[in-house]
């Protein structure tokens, strides 16, 4: 199989990278109706598999789980989760032949084996669904021409997909139809019904492409969403401790600081996050972020280039074939870091203290979000897609670190995201140690910026630069859509 993206000509590549349309609420007037009375069989019962299935069932769909014979015989976690929630469970041979829609929600590295197993069992004219397009785009999976291939990709972890649905809402979602596999022209109707069944239509749906989803998703998770948080955690902790800060305090400031800082980001973008700082601290955070962007731009661009060319995917798939040797070694190295093994701080840190003592962390967030967004847009990805794969998901990933440090983040994210995270962090940490960390001043981290006079013109210009960045404009628009839709959902 050949990388699908690399088989396209330049015009086709640009068209698919740039596919992105915010869908109107009235396009989902039929909600999940197109799939009512049809059989949906989900393969895989992890976080996305279970929680999407629960939502789909609550939306009136007929949902069952197809698991491997061994998983059923040995009553593994997937079997227990499905049966304990009252779902019908069977083998591939028992359930796939009757399915109108087979939804593959297994990990990326299992997709080829799963598709190879289920495709011969699927009835003519059935549909195959994904929530991430890696298998189609990067692996280049060839699917029978009578099968419709669609994607519904919630921009949140599976647990959030369920919790938002239970609140009467949903999570922003990308949907797509594979242009090589839409024989009956019903792909969009299937994708819309599936998205509505998970509640995504109540939070905002982008009509995208498999290519745009994969390339932007890989870029976001490797850089700002995971790689920057990992690199920032390790660098900031080591810097604090080297300057005499109590290790327990340093650990807590970082572990819970990302979540506190990005909560402001979620509510009001980079503008609100920066507004939480005093004026002298804001000016310093802005200056630090500009330095960071200049230093890290080539690294962000290299990751984007390797994602576009397929070099990243081929390297990772080679590690899959080698029993994940690199991934497992990097995971073990992370577990041995001083940050992961620091004692817990028993004292309290106020919400404002996380901002006042975390100026460098705020600068890292700002620089990482803007760089990821800019690099994606420069590569042909539309701004809305770039926003969802950078700023939007960051608070959700920061929350995992607040639970159990980097260990939890790397457990929750996919193996694909984890591999890319280590690639980025392993390059970013030495780069910033060499070119940036030694230039920090008192008040950048662990202490408050000393009070000082502020030049009005400088503050005006910095405020305008922050608020006029393109990600702030698109973020304001998309957060507005979500707020409006939530009001409609609650009222309804």
From Swiss-Prot:
SUPFAM superfamilies: 6-phosphogluconate dehydrogenase C-terminal domain-like, NAD(P)-binding Rossmann-fold domains. GO terms for cellular component: cytosol. Keywords: Amino-acid biosynthesis, Branched-chain amino acid biosynthesis, Magnesium, Metal-binding, NADP, Oxidoreductase, Repeat. Binds 2 magnesium ions per subunit. The active site is at residue 132. NADP(+) binds at residues 45-48, 68, 76, 78, 108-110, 158. Residues 209-344, 345-485 form the KARI C-terminal knotted domain. It catalyses: (2R)-2,3-dihydroxy-3-methylbutanoate + NADP(+) = (2S)-2-acetolactate + NADPH + H(+); (2R,3R)-2,3-dihydroxy-3-methylpentanoate + NADP(+) = (S)-2-ethyl-2-hydroxy-3-oxobutanoate + NADPH + H(+). Substrate binds at residue 414. GO terms for biological process: isoleucine biosynthetic process; L-valine biosynthetic process. Involved in the biosynthesis of branched-chain amino acids (BCAA). Catalyzes an alkyl-migration followed by a ketol-acid reduction of (S)-2-acetolactate (S2AL) to yield (R)-2,3-dihydroxy-isovalerate. In the isomerase reaction, S2AL is rearranged via a Mg-dependent methyl migration to produce 3-hydroxy-3-methyl-2-ketobutyrate (HMKB). In the reductase reaction, this 2-ketoacid undergoes a metal-dependent reduction by NADPH to yield (R)-2,3-dihydroxy-isovalerate. Belongs to the ketol-acid reductoisomerase family. PANTHER family: KETOL-ACID REDUCTOISOMERASE, MITOCHONDRIAL. NCBIfam families: ilvC, PRK05225.1. This is Ketol-acid reductoisomerase (NADP(+)). It comes from Yersinia pseudotuberculosis serotype O:1b (strain IP 31758). The gene is ilvC.
């Amino acid at each position: 199989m050949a990388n699908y993206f690399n088989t396209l000509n330049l015009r086709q590549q640009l068209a698919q990278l740039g596919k992105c349309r915010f869908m109107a609420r009235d396009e989902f007037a039929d909600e999940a109706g197109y799939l009512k009375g049809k059989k949906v069989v989900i393969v895989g019962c992890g976080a996305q598999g279970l929680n999407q299935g629960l939502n789909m069932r609550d939306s009136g769909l007929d949902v069952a789980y197809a698991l491997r014979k061994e998983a059923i015989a040995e009553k593994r976690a997937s079997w227990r989760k499905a049966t304990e929630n009252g779902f019908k469970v069977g083998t591939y041979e028992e359930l796939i032949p009757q399915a109108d829609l087979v939804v593959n929600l297994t990990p990326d590295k299992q997709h080829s084996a799963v598709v190879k197993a289920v495709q011969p069992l699927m009835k003519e004219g059935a549909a195959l669904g994904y929530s991430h397009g890696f298998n189609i785009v990067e692996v280049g999976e060839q699917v029978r021409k009578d099968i419709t291939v669609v994607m519904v990709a919630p921009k949140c972890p599976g647990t959030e997909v369920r919790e938002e649905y239970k609140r009467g809402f949903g999570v922003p979602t990308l949907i797509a139809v594979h242009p090589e596999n839409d024989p009956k022209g019903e792909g969009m109707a299937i994708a819309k019904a599936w998205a509505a069944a998970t509640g995504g239509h109540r939070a905002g749906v982008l009509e995208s492409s498999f290519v745009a989803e994969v390339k932007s998703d890989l870029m976001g998770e490797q850089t700002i969403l995971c790689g920057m948080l990992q690199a920032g955690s390790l660098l900031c902790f080591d810097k604090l401790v080297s300057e005499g800060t109590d290790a327990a305090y340093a650990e807590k400031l970082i572990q819970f600081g990302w979540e506190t800082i990005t909560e402001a980001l979620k509510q009001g973008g980079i503008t609100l996050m920066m507004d939480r700082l005093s004026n002298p601290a804001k000016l310093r955070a802005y200056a630090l972020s500009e330095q960071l962007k200049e230093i890290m731009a080539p690294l962000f661009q290299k990751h984007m280039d390797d994602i576009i060319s397929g070099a990243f995917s081929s390297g990772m798939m080679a590690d899959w074939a080698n029993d994940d040797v690199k991934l497992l070694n990097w995971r073990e190295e992370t577990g041995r870091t001083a940050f992961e093994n620091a004692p817990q701080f028993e004292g309290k840190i106020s919400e404002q203290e996380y901002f006042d003592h975390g100026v460098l962390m705020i600068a890292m967030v700002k620089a990482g979000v803007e760089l990821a967004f800019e690099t994606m847009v420069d590569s042909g990805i539309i701004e809305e897609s770039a926003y969802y794969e950078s700023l939007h998901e960051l608070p959700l990933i920061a929350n995992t670190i607040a639970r159990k440090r980097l260990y939890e983040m790397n457990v929750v994210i996919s193996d694909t995201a984890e591999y890319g995270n280590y690639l980025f962090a392993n390059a970013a940490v030495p780069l910033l140690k060499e070119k940036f960390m030694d230039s920090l001043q008192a008040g950048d981290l662990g202490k408050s910026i000393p009070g000082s006079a502020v030049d009005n013109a400088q503050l005006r210009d910095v405020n305008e630069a922050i608020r006029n960045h393109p990600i702030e404009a698109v973020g304001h628009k998309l957060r507005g859509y979500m707020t409006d839709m939530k009001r409609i959902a609650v009222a309804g």
